Amino acid sequence: MISIEQADKIKELVALIRKADEERINFALSGIEEFEAKVNNAVEALDMFLDEIIDHNTRV
C-alpha cells in the first residue's frame, strides 16, 4: 500500500509528464510550421528564378 505522500508525489510526476508531453507536441507542431515556411520560401524563390529565365529567353 502506498502512503498519501507517495500518492502526492506520483500525482506530481504524472502532471510533469503530461506537461512535458504537451510541450513536446507544441514543439513538434511549431517545427513543422517552420519547415513548411522554409519549403514555401524555397519554392517561391525557385518560381521567381524560373520566371526570370523564361523572361530572359523570350526576349532573346
UniProtKB/Swiss-Prot annotation:
Pfam families per the UniProt record, alphabetical: DUF7438
InterPro entries attached to this UniProt entry: DUF7438 (IPR055861)
Protein origin, superkingdom: Viruses
Name used for this protein in its record: Uncharacterized 6.8 kDa protein in mobD-ri intergenic region
Organism in which the protein naturally occurs: Enterobacteria phage T4
